[in-house]
Amino acid sequence: MFQKLRKSKKLVLIAMACATFAIAGCGSDTTKSIADNGKSVTWSETFDGTKTDFAVKSSPTHAVSMSQATTEMMLQLGLEDKMAGTAFKEEEIYPPLQAAYDKVKVLSDKWPSYEVFMSVKPDFATGWPDSFSKRAIPADKMIAQKVNIWLPESMLSTKADLETNFNDMIKLGEIFGVKSKAEEWVAGQRKTLEAIQAKLKDLPRKRVFIYDSEDGQPFTAFEGYTTNILKLIGADNVMSGLGVDKTWAKGSWETVIAQNPDYIIIADYGTSIRNDDDFQQKIEKIKSNPQLQDITAVKEGHFIRVKLSEITPGVRTVDALKRLAEEIHGVKID
């Protein structure tokens, strides 16, 4: 699952060097200035060791999102009319955003070809790092056509947490001239999270293991966003702090056994485009493994289903944390 993403994350995080480009916004003359003082919104990204500086003075009008997560981020900010297309839908769209999503042109089930991408005259692109690699459309080809590229920091850093995600939403809002709307959304998410945490403050913390898939040994979360958001609801990833400085990677069942999690959180791809086992099949696979029978989570049948989009950066995190908190701690949160 995340194996495809890890290589490009490394590329994006390589030390900045070589040429620096500045790309101006390509919005139409009728697009309002982003800031009252007319100053550009700026940011930088690094691709294959080359730093690129981007700047937009007017909000983009032909944006393309190359991942479901960034698509939902844009839709949450009401930017569907600024989107020329979307791609790589991995599961069902977040229900509150379905109507907005239906207004956006779908360019491809996965990544579009360069020709299809350019056919909608994009002036802005966003998505997971892989979207701008040789696996999809290399960043340099977009940059050559003066397409601004923005990568959420929460999708890059092994230190990313919910605050990183919130900052990404605010930056996206700033780029599109809707910063106040982004800030309002963030404030609402903070309020909801505070209510969740108030219900949990006197409860003991639980130990969890995140099971994505396996090939003899489990593919799991170690550090980064998934681990850090679970901490917010009193759930500690048993694979964190073991010296593996990666977000997702292959682990070992021996380590899981030694760590003895109370719950196993299972990524369910049953309705996605990924070729993985669904939730029930994964449970049966775990239960049929003789060496796992003494793990507390297995003995007590503590398996929790999640969708990938619920435990990775995007707009669903706080809603997912509410449900996960209820299941992990056995409480009802209004």
Predicted regions mapped to residue ranges:
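Bacterial Sec-exported substrate-binding components of ABC uptake systems
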Residues: 2-12, 25-72, 175-210, 327-334
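Extracytoplasmic substrate-binding proteins
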Residues: 138-214, 240, 301-334
